From Swiss-Prot:
It holds the Pfam family DB. This is Ig-like and fibronectin type-III domain-containing protein 2. SUPFAM superfamilies: Fibronectin type III (SSF49265), Immunoglobulin (SSF48726). Residues 1437-1526 are cytoplasmic. InterPro entries: Cys_repeat_1, DB, FN3_dom, FN3_sf, Ig-like_dom, Ig-like_dom_sf, Ig-like_fold, Ig_sub.
Amino acid sequence: MMRWRLAVLFLTLLASTTGDDTTTKASVSTTTKKGTDGPHLTTDDEGFLTVIQGFATQLQCVLNTCSKDVIWYKDGSQISKGSQFLNTTSEKAYKIQHSIEVDYEKGCSGECDDSKPCGDGFSCVDNQCCSCRREEFTLVLRNLTFDESGRYRCQLGNKSELLEFQVEVLESGLKGGFHENISYDHSECCQEKGISPLCRGMCKPSEMDQHHFDPTSCKTDDYKHFLSCATEDGTRSHVHCCKTQLVPSFCYDFCSGDFQMLRRSHRLCLYYLPEIFSCLDRAYLPYPDPPTAIEVNAVEHDKLSVCWKEPEKHESNKMFPILDYAVYFKEIPNFPLLGGDMGLPLLTGDYSDIGDIQEDDYQQEEDDAEEVVKDSTIAPRGKRDVDFESDGVKVQIREKRSTMVIVTRDDVTNSTTIREFAFQNVNTTERCVTLSDLRSSTRYIVYVTARNEYGTSVPSVRNIASTNVHMVKNNASLPDSMKCCTDANVTSFCSSKMCNVAEDPSSFSTITIATTCRAEWPKVSPCIADGRNHTDCCLKKGVQHDCLEICSGSTKELGVHSVLCLNLDLQAIYQCIRQGYETHPSAPGNVTISELTAHSVTVQWTEPNSNAHLVENYTLFIRKNEHGEAVRTVKNVISPHVELGLDPDSEYVLTLQSHSANGTSLPSTAKLFSTLPTTRPPLCTIGEPIYMNDGRVMICDAVNPCPNGFRCTGAGSDLSYCCPHDGTHSSEEFTSCCKEQKMPESCMSSCQYNMTLPESCKENLNTWVQCASEGHDHLRCCLQEEVSKPCQTACMHPFTVPADECFSEVSKYRTCFSAAHQALPAAVRNVEVSSISKDSATISWEDLEANIIVFRVQLFEKGGNLIKTENSSADIFRFIDLEPNKDYSVRVTAINFLGEGPPSWNATFTTKPAQIYEGDRPVAPEKLRISWNSGPRVNVTWDPVSVRRNAEVVTKPIEYTIYYLDTEQSSTWTTLRTNQTWVVMRDLRKDALYYVYVTAKEDNRTSRSSSIITILAQKDSPGLPEPTIVIEPDHKDGVFSPGEKISINCSLPNIKKHLNIDLTVGSHVVQNDHGALWVILETEADEAMDTATCAVSDTDGRQHVAMKHLVLERKASVTMKKDKIRVLDDQSVEIECIYRGGGLDPKISFEKDGKKASRGFLNLKKTEAGYVAKWHIRKVKQEDAGFYKCVVTSSDGSRVEASSEVIFSTETLPVNPKLILQCCEDEGITGDCLQACNIGRTSLSIKNQNCTRFAVSLLKCASDIRDHSDCCIASGVTSKCLPLCSGDSFSPDIDCSEHAVSIMTCSVKSHEHAPSEVSNVRIKASEGKVNIEWDYPLTKDYKYFAVYYRKAHDDHEDWHKLKTIQQNIELDVDPSEDYEVGILAANALGHSRLMYSAIPKDSEPRRSASKGSSSAFWIVVILVVFGVLIAGLAVLSKRRELPYPIGKFIGRRNDPNQPTVAFENPAYGEPWGGAEVEIRGLGGSATTGTAAATQSEWQSANLEANSTTDNSHEYRNGMRYAKLET
């Protein structure tokens, strides 16, 4: 409950006792007349007591004589007799103050002791029975809780003499036990000053719960005397501490020694006792005092200077010197959406919050105090929530002490943006500090704290200071951004508010900019950024990320979430932009490519147009113009710059940036260029030749031999290059290298791969390493040979090692260096472990070489101990007799006749547990129910989970996960985790229905879900009872036989409410009769039954759903996963069947065409669904096609089977040479949907992109005979559309447009591992025949080539296609026609990119001699006529005097009004961080009338036309956009 409400309640209850220093007592009546002689009970306390939770009170009971029969009762139950409590009474809650007053005038007589007590009316004093005057049995109630409320009775035996008290405990709103850590003790001072016993609890708060304390009964003098003790007779004030603790100002009287009188408003101060006592206690601990005399002065436009004085020292802290200070500062946001000139009126006073009472409020008179209490705006803790709505955006401002949070919520997308304004701090040991990187013309709150070894002081007095206004030093630095905005077609209304960078926008303009003009930012941002990158400054000023696009001049649109930062950060953005004009250079100008080779580029540029004198260096960014290529960054470049190491015949894009000491420019115009192709064939059969620094190929001869590892091709000619060795080995010795390196003659015999290095040649180890290694990287082999880490530099660059330390590794070096020269097998690749069971696992790998005689398979334990070594002649092996739930690792080594190759990398796996039954999982939580419901918050609870499903007790902590879902507005479950058996769901939508269930988790084992309840988020709305499902007969194993008669009963506890009960089991649904609390279904078990679901609901829509799973002993059945499996040559195939049914250990086998299948191997796995059997065939051939049967034989001899057809195809080529991407382009697919067609690009999800308008085209281009239905199933393609994924027949009536992108993506994936493309196509023509040759990398993978050709310039002619497995082919063509030719490589995985070439027609056609001279004459005549005509047209075009019909078709290259097209620089923004833009469809020249058609060919949505009048600012056109003349 909120303290404010409690304060009003408490004030009402105590109104009769306030206003003066007198109190009125209610007498406590007895049921008998009090005589002067008989025993009777008396009290000074009232009969009705209202006391405060957490404090103590007393119930006085005094007997006018002595008796052992005085008994205390609570609510009729006895709790004590005499001065002793009963055993059932908690002494922590009660205490009896027992005292006896002896009447010595009557004297003493007789003797007494423990065994001989005195009689009634007497008390044993010094072993004598003395007459009693009175005996007190006062009951003290300690640490009051609500359980102590009730009726108390003090009674004399069983007589009618009694006292009754009614005790009412009020909620205090204070945290329990808050007083326990308060250490001060003013008990002696309080006793000396005569403070009332009812008030002495505040003199020593640590015992406040032990003694009677009633702050409402304390008088003015009590508080005066107590505060005199707490403030050392008024010499110390605690008011400042109370301010920092946010104690209301009308309670400051209790923080100083200047207490005047008790007022009605002081009643509210009860709820601030923890803060007040903490401040009183803090003064006597060695904390430092806060710094004083805080002075804050503005420096420049973005700094504040803060200075202070050292805090005063006291007796308590003089032994603890100040260690350092912390300066805290926070921006006071000016939020225009709230209206007003100053925006949000925050924290205008010292430590005050929105709505807090001002300091002078607590000084008013008694009559006015009541009005203060009634004012709803001055709650004890202040009003901390402010909500408002503007332009459809809800804004909520939440403040808690020193942090302010502004939240905007978009009702359309149901999303929020949060902005927090919290204090930042700077630590220092000085008494002055300068705060930098602040916002100009902005108010800040500043305070300082001091720290010593004991702790930190309270904050000092807060200061509010403003930074200075930012003034531009040089107006010449401001660009003409208004003209730029006008040229960019920004509306004049928005341009006047956004493009004038010389001044910050006003509050009213800010609201317009954030709402009406927000759509103009893509045009305005590049204009005001002016080629500079202001992002670093904006980040320092705390600009929110949604508005950082403005700082970088981005053309991205700002979403609705930017409304918040536009209102809060716009002034800081304009401040950074103005600073950048003075300190940041613009981008380099006139970037040009001056020289190109196959492997290098020369780039030149000029100085920036702005702030060129500030430039310190330039940075070059270059990358291939392909998706996903890495960016090469070259710093400190100087114009002209030569960049080497580029790939030949490749397209690149580069850009430059300028850097100054204070910032950087935006990227320059992106330059697109292509390196030259290599012009000197032949290329190396493997790898690339050696190139010189200038990009030219290195020429080798006898004088300039190739280095080790390379051979000189074409020796004796001018086309001799250094190419890598093509395979097996180059030599068995390296003596020539040793001679060149001046190896001593005594060590020359070691320069062979079958020799090692002797000890006498240790000092020549590095020479031997460099020659033997041939400069190749042998690190993998060295790691396998376990070469020590310091000595691994012999296996890679720089090929030098310390001789003394690494000489012992020579034998390992020799093994690795000689491996490349002995034709040993390569390391086995792609080792995979599959079909893992509790005692077996299958190991498979790639068989890449044909000369392997055997594979060695080694199995290791987790610690590395070798367990088994097996040999396999195939590329697969299965280990059996393994231990369950154990870690293993395996590696494979290939062996041929020359020896064994290096071992593969280890593959690790873990066998499955011996028992796959899920009995080790905890049971599902039960009795999920509502504890309380307040509407937006609901507390749900459940019974704890203590056992697992196998009845074992859980041994580890249980973590519960609660799931809840808004049934009307959400499809996403929200989760909460807890280790308790309850949780509070917060921020629920009022009056909404929610589904709720809970699961339990022990380690990584999760239970099934509990029953599902429906909660109505409505105050005091209880949940529905949980239904109970009982199934008879109750089989312990939970397994029922088909046809067995079962009875399923769903019932509810006895409640007085009509509820609907629906019991669903398979296809059976039964409902309860009106008023009945149960429903029964009697039926026979069948295979359709797997779950019994009982749902209880009421008229409000709430539900409680319970489920119970049924397991049926199914009839034996076997099904194939696919009826038809299409497989291509050299692929692998997996035929999968699933067996369900009774019986143990069924025998499963596969047959092919009626006979036992011989090629392949079987993988068998047992699951909850049954047995899954897979017949795996690697590298399928033609003879493997046919019908396969999965045959299952049970223990009783019954046999079931299912069949599937394997269809073999070698046709993997398309009908024309166009690839998928080309097909999509031809079909007109554009935008993001085109990415689905591109191999290597991230495929788009149909959930994120709407490509249904291209569905027909996508499905057409995705047509493929390959079977990729597994991928389609995983991508969510429905079964009716799966034929499109396997090349089967398909009904045109079925709509599969929603799956078009997924089907295309799967088709693309099947091509990603296709063969690489051919290279170096060579064409030789002779007498009507053309011989075509090409190069292809050496590989042992199966492949063939397809050659397409047709006549050039005839798009209507069909392509001719030929296939071959050789790297050449001969074509019959017409020698008088030009032909275009395309060649690709293909295998089972797909085909490569097409390599195009051309066949020119015969340049010397055979014609008759009689016609030759005549033809030549007419050719000359025609050429002369055309020459004269062309010259005339050229002259007229220069004079602009061409007739309209002719001029229309002649482009004027120098026309300044010629339309240009701008496209986005891919390198813009963060270097290379922008999205790529593909440019296709550039047409010829066009007039204004055809401009729209030309622009429609562009695929980017952000294209902008270059202004025809912006001739004076063309340099700025190169920042974000490049320009193409069309």
